[in-house]
């Protein structure tokens, strides 16, 4: 009898073991069963564009949660994010990218500064990794190589939006581009010459070093030029001083000023200049009405924040990476590239499309004005410009 009991117990034990082997007992989730995906996020945690970098990183975290349906996994693979600070320095960014690539990372994202993005792009090509540039706006990022994508807008889209503000009657008009001596600044000069110069305007630049903090000489030079239109293209912490210099010199009383709407902290610091400018806008959270933007607003509200200028760039980068990993079922770079080319999706700004021919991020833009005074200055949407109207020309891959 004891023998029969022992045999029966052994049989049950064997059957249980067989079922565990065949059925897997499934104590682990699908994400545990597949290798995780490592993403390197290289952006400006410090430096001139640190506030933009913070927005990008926060947007990426919210976008990753949104795109993975709160699981942090894509296609059953956990997404691990490693952050590196480039401080806006291309050399630091390239070193960080090479370090991560050397550790086996197949996906790099970030780049707050255009000069940084333009140096990481060739690293991505040489090492065959996926690179999704962030807030960096230089046109040369588009069409750089098939490994390089962007999650934000590009300068040409800014200038095309500005063109909808100034109209088509530019023949014989004088336009001055006021920009920093940087890749971003030069990209704006080039784009204005192409778009507004192509419409008949004469375009001249006035540029200031990135290190400048006294803008009176540049403001006076602009006033003396007597332009019909001034297009300031500025980024970073010195913007308030730049605007004050223009206002103090009386430029707003003598010329029409069109510029990009900067981050929210700039509204109050622009002083009396705020309501004197016509703004093209990449993004402000009151403009779009859609599910993705609602999710971004709600997630940041829980943190006591509201979305700012570059939160969507991080959000979209996460959407792109999740989509690429899901469609590739892993980190096959060729498959991830193919998955992103031509992809249309709903982003915080609205419907966006990655153009297959050069990886331009086609997206709507906005025209706005600032209302109020002091700490109560807020943007008001005047109109949304559909993506078809602000699509940049194709830049074939190198």
Task: Give the role of each language-model region.
Residues 33-61, 84-91, 112-115, 178-186, ...:
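Extracytoplasmic "Venus flytrap"
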Residues 41, 100-112, 132-134, 174-179, ...:
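Periplasmic-binding protein-like
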Residues 245-315, 326-329, 380-398:
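Extracellular/periplasmic periplasmic-binding protein-like sensory domains
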Residues 31-32, 36, 51-56, 66, ...:
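Beta-alpha junction/loop-to-helix N-cap segments that form part of ligand/metal-binding clefts
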Residues 86, 132-133, 139, 210-211, ...:
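Venus flytrap/periplasmic-binding-protein-like
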Residues 33, 37, 348-398:
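Solvent-exposed, acidic/polar segments of extracytosolic/periplasmic ligand-binding ectodomains
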Residues 95, 115, 138-140, 147-249, ...:
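Extracellular/periplasmic Venus flytrap/periplasmic-binding protein
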Residues 1-38, 398:
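Short, low-complexity disordered leader/linker segments with a strong preference
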């Amino acid at each position: 009898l004891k023998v029969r009991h022992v045999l029966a117990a052994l049989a049950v034990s064997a059957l249980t073991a067989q079922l565990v082997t065949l059925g897997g007992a499934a104590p682990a989730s699908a994400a545990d069963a597949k290798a995780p995906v490592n993403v390197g996020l290289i952006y400006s945690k410090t430096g001139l564009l640190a506030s933009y970098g913070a927005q990008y990183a926060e947007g990426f975290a919210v976008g990753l949660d949104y795109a993975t349906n709160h699981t942090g996994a894509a296609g059953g693979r956990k997404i691990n994010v490693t952050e590196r600070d480039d401080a806006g320095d291309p050399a630091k960014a390239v070193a960080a990218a090479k370090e991560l690539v050397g550790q086996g990372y197949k996906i790099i994202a970030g780049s707050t500064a255009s000069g940084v993005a333009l140096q990481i792009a060739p690293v991505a090509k040489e090492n065959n990794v996926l690179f999704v540039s962030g807030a960096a706006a230089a046109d040369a990022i588009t069409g750089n190589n098939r490994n390089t994508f962007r999650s934000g807008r590009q300068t040409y889209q800014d200038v095309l939006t500005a063109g909808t503000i100034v109209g088509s009657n530019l023949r014989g008009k004088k336009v001055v581009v006021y920009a920093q001596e940087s890749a971003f600044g030069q990209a704006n000069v080039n784009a204005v010459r192409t778009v507004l110069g192509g419409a008949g305007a004469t375009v001249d630049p006035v540029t200031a070093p990135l290190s400048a903090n006294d803008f009176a000489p540049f403001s006076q030079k602009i006033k003396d030029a007597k332009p019909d239109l001034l297009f300031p293209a500025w980024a970073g912490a010195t913007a308030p001083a730049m605007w004050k210099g223009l206002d103090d010199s009386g430029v707003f009383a003598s010329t029409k000023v069109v510029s990009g709407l900067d981050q929210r902290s700039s509204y109050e610091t622009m002083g009396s200049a705020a309501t004197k400018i016509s703004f093209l806008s990449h993004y402000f959270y009151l403009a779009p009405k859609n599910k993705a933007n609602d999710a971004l607003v709600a997630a940041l509200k829980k943190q006591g924040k509201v979305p700012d200028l570059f939160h969507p760039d991080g959000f979209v980068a996460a959407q792109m990476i999740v989509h690429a990993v899901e469609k590739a079922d892993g980190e096959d770079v060729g498959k991830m590239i193919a998955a992103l080319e031509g992809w249309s999706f709903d982003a915080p700004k609205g419907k966006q499309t990655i153009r297959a021919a050069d990886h331009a991020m086609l997206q709507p833009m906005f025209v706005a004005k600032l209302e109020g005074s002091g700490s109560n200055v807020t943007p008001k949407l005047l109109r949304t410009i559909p993506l078809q109207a602000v699509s940049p020309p194709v830049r074939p891959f190198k």
